A protein has these predicted regions:
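Carbohydrate-binding surfaces of carbohydrate-active enzymes
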Residues: 193-197, 227, 239-240, 260-264, ...
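An acidic-aromatic substrate-binding cleft motif
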Residues: 1-19, 26, 30-33
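Aromatic-lined substrate-binding rim segments of carbohydrate-active enzymes
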Residues: 22-28, 36-100, 128, 229-237, ...
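Polysaccharide-binding and catalytic clefts of secreted carbohydrate-active enzymes
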Residues: 97-288
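Conserved, mostly hydrophobic/aromatic
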Residues: 8, 27, 35, 64, ...
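Short, acidic/polar
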Residues: 15-29, 120-126, 248-259, 321-329
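The substrate-binding groove and active-site-proximal loops of carbohydrate-active enzymes
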Residues: 6-17, 40-55, 102-121, 146-150, ...
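Short, solvent-exposed turn/loop segments enriched in Gly/Ser/Thr/Pro and often Arg
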Residues: 11-13, 38-41, 74-83, 138-147, ...
Length: 682
């Protein structure tokens, strides 16, 4: 990186060329250092097949460079032009209903189609060759938001053939596929790979093993589609040019873990107050997106699209309050962003996103948004220059697995049980206490964490069980939850013993029965008796989650082997049996939470874990903040930057030691204004 810090997504092709110098001048005055361009400009760069026109983009890059602004170029594969669709209609995607998704939006492409891939290779090669020596170009973005418009996943003939080849490579023989998928059920056996279709709409249900492999295949397909482009670019441009992609938080169409292996770093698109929401994201929801994306590469990242104003397609969302736009940008930095690029520079006059407002309004005349973002950039730029490469440090990790999410998306087990929802619930419990969290892969080195939370480890194998066991034996505290060890990796139910299957020895329990609660709730009480679920009158709580100690959605009926109970159910026919357990193993402990905890139960569990392991808040003894105020930090070479973020619309009193030096923000008389922030040197 070269300290870019702040930028904007710029579409010069949307405006008369005589306007470009004015835009560049206004960007410089604002403090912008980088723009992203061209990711939706295929027709402008190739108005007809084989005829390339990059001269307009040369001029735009040069105008910006003269004002000290460098450019990131996006490959345009997210929006093939109309002339291509007319010549090759089969490059359009086909949904599970067999209907072709047509031209007129974006991502109207099949990423497996060989004809389309050839066009992509040609345009990417032409761009790389043309811009490789341009001093104004510093990096490349591949495509745009993989998966954003591909939720149905293309099921055309090309994808069918590619899926069959993928299966043949994975299973070698059709007999192995039949075994892995359990095709004996409903007479689904195959005699040849050519008989296997994508999981199209059927009269009655679908094979969960087939659907899981389909999701795996499509993730691999997207990664391969991206790698075709990254390989071309790397073979042509200087090694100093970076390659990235703008991801979308917990979107799971493609594994960002796999995708990131071909990138220099990842980017994230953050819209806390999207038009599709009735209110802005809660602060913990912003935090979990940012920490989740940082966990993809275990490194600082960029925000390639940071909300700058009102968003909208057919309808528009609410206007962010004064101070929220800067606060959200600083929040991104606090969680690991080295550069923040605002979407977009100027509100577009036409097209689907004409109501997706930018730094400049439709008129192009700078207003309050421009001024507010300008104050932010002036305030934060000196800090961010010094902070580049610094990372948040965490003692707690949450395991995130794309395959676990896919499997539970196929079979949630009970209504509203969602894999990512569970990750976020555990994250929030630590976030509320200002305890930082990292997100990790299942096979990552866990030894640096005091606590590792692994929700819904639905698919399991012996390697995963051994990995977790080694972590615990070496002194770690592992938390597994309901539905752990239910299935093998092929999505067939585990049959070699009671649940939690391969985790039984580690956890010191068995689960031979369970109660799929759905919307019901079961009271829970502490085994020690120091905490219980009774109100002031001594009556047990009603069977709603509320603020009581309750189990919801699911109740594993646990039999203790070597484990000890921590919380017991206090109702239903299994009253008195454990809901939460702990098992000592080696130098560490393995905890099991056999339900979805209510908020109060979750808080009690996290308090217990923090006390047991000595896990500390960022606040420590030198900073005390009220509810609604977040404290987090980044560290580098022994230096620490502390961020205090007021996510409320009220002024907040902050108690801090005088040993801290205020670097930026508006902390005055130990008070933070509504939606205010402060960065301290600690």
């Amino acid at each position: 990186m070269k300290n870019y810090q702040f930028g904007a997504d710029y579409y010069p092709e949307h405006w008369p060329e005589q306007r470009w110098p004015m835009d560049a001048k206004l960007m410089k005055e604002l403090g912008l250092k980088v723009v992203r361009m061209a990711e939706f400009s295929w027709h402008k760069m190739e108005p007809e097949g084989g005829h390339y026109d990059f001269e307009w983009l040369d001029r735009a890059i040069d105008i910006l460079r003269k004002e000290g602004i460098v450019s990131v170029l996006g490959t345009p594969s997210a929006a093939p032009p109309a002339w291509m669709i007319r010549k090759h209609p089969k490059i359009q995607p086909v949904g599970p209903d067999g209907i072709t998704r047509g031209f007129g939006g974006r991502h109207h492409d099949c990423q497996s189609n060989p004809v389309y891939r050839e066009y992509v290779k040609k345009i990417v090669t032409a761009m790389a060759e043309h811009f490789k020596d341009n001093p104004g170009v510093v990096g490349w973005q591949i495509d745009n938001e993989f998966g954003n418009s591909h939720y149905d996943l293309c099921m055309c003939d090309s994808c069918k053939a590619s899926f069959q080849k993928w299966l043949a490579k994975r299973y070698v023989t059709v007999e192995e596929l039949n075994k892995a998928w359990g095709t004996y059920f409903w007479s689904q056996e195959y005699n040849d790979f050519s008989e296997v279709y994508p999981p199209v709409k059927t009269p009655c249900g679908a094979n969960p093993s087939q659907v899981l492999d389909w999701k795996r295949f499509h993730s691999d397909l997207i990664c391969d589609f991206s790698k075709v482009q990254t390989d071309i670019i790397r073979s042509i441009v200087p090694k100093e040019h970076f390659i990235t992609h703008n991801c979308m938080g917990f979107s799971d169409i493609v594994s960002y873990y796999d995708l990131s292996t071909q990138l220099d770093f990842v980017c994230h698109d953050l819209y806390p107050f999207g038009y599709w929401r009735d209110h802005s994201l809660e602060p913990f929801e912003i935090g979990v997106e940012l920490d989740g994306i940082r966990g993809v590469c275990k490194a600082p990242f960029w925000i390639m699209e940071q909300q700058s104003s009102v968003t909208g397609w057919e309808i528009m969302g609410r206007k962010p309050a004064s101070g929220q736009i800067p606060l959200w940008a600083v929040d991104s930095v606090a969680h690991g962003a080295d550069t923040v690029v605002f979407f977009r520079w100027r509100s577009c006059l036409g097209g689907t996103e004409q109501y997706w407002h930018g730094i400049l309004p439709h008129s192009g005349i700078p207003g309050k948004t421009y001024e507010e973002i300008g104050r932010l950039i002036k305030d934060m730029t000196p800090v961010m220059k010094e902070m580049e490469g610094a990372m948040p440090t965490a003692q707690v990790a949450i395991v995130r697995s794309y395959e676990q999410g896919w499997a539970l998306d196929i079979q949630p087990n009970v209504k509203d049980l969602n894999y990512y929802g569970q990750l976020i619930k555990y994250y929030k419990a630590f976030y509320d206490k200002n305890i930082p969290v990292d997100f990790v892969k299942e096979d990552d080195d866990l030894s640096g964490y005091k606590v590792v939370i692994a929700p819904l480890q639905y698919l399991a194998d012996s390697d995963l069980a051994a990995h977790y066991e080694e972590y615990v034996k070496q002194g770690g505290n592992l938390v597994l939850t309901m539905r752990a060890g239910v299935k093998e990796r092929n999505n067939l139910c585990f049959s070699e013993g009671p649940l939690p299957g391969l985790f039984s020895g580690l956890l010191g329990i068995t689960v031979e029965e369970y109660d799929p609660l759905g919307s019901a709730c079961v009271p829970v009480k502490s085994v020690s008796g120091t905490e219980d679920n009774r109100d002031a009158s001594g009556d047990t709580c009603s069977k709603t989650a509320g603020d009581e100690l309750c189990a919801s959605k699911w109740a594993d009926i646990i039999t203790l082997k070597s484990a000890k109970p921590v919380f017991d159910y206090d109702g239903e026919s299994y009253e008195g049996t454990p809901a939460v357990t702990v098992n000592s193993l080696g130098e560490g402990k393995a905890w099991y939470v056999g339900c979805e905890p209510s908020e109060s139960l979750m808080e009690a569990i996290v308090d217990m874990l923090a006390k047991e392991t000595g896990t500390e808040s960022v606040e420590g003894s030198d900073i005390k903040v009220p509810a609604g105020v977040e404290v987090t930090s980044r560290e580098k070479n022994g230096k620490k930057w502390i961020f205090i973020l007021n996510h409320t619309d009220e002024e907040k009193k902050i108690d801090i030691s005088d040993r801290f030096r205020i670097l930026s923000g508006a902390l005055k008389d130990n008070k933070l204004q509504p939606y205010g922030y402060a960065v301290l040197e600690g």
